[in-house]
A protein has these predicted regions:
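Post-transcriptional modification and biogenesis factors for structured RNAs
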Residues: 1-165
């Protein structure tokens, strides 16, 4: 599974998403221009010491990325979409695409891929969720559909006691 951030602006969000990718094995694709330097201390701090676990790819444009992976399915996450992210049957090689924090994905991109746009249901009064939170919500739904393959599902219990949920 792949996470795509189109022109991300806030280094802390990208760092948090990188940490999510490290913990899940998802690949991270960053589409330029980035709103920060990859040497940014907030980016590195948010990703903690997990950067060595993340496969990060940089692309000069979304068109170049899409062309390179044209045989894959792309889902475009937007507050403007009609379909819920829960209505999709994800494949493990799908691309989940998210826009920049201030504006989301460009309207022409959403129009061109209208059939593959998805949204997270939320209150009408709320404009949007934080980018890193939105990525986590959609990513874990996709992983859940595949029984969290290759991920550790069970912990060691709480203080040596068996716990049931």
């Amino acid at each position: 599974m792949h996470i795509v951030l189109v022109e991300p602006e806030i280094p802390g969000n990208t760092g948090n998403i990188a940490r999510l990718c490290a913990g899940t094995g998802m690949e991270l694709h960053l589409v330029r221009p980035l709103g920060f330097s990859t040497d940014d201390k907030h980016l590195k701090r948010a990703g903690l010491d997990y950067w060595h676990l993340v496969r990060v790819h940089y692309h000069d444009s979304f068109a170049a990325l899409h062309q390179q992976y044209q045989e894959h399915t792309f889902y475009f996450c937007s507050t403007k979409a009609r379909h819920s992210y829960c209505d999709i049957s994800y494949k493990m090689d799908d691309f989940l695409v998210f826009g920049k924090e201030s504006a989301g994905l460009p309207e022409p991109l959403l129009t061109a891929h209208a059939a593959n746009t998805i949204r997270i249901p939320m209150r009408e009064e709320a404009r949007s969720l934080n980018l890193s939170n939105a990525v986590a919500v959609v990513a874990f739904e996709a992983l859940r559909q595949h029984q969290f393959v290759d991920l550790r599902i069970h912990g060691n219990g709480c203080h040596g006691r068996s716990t049931q949920i």
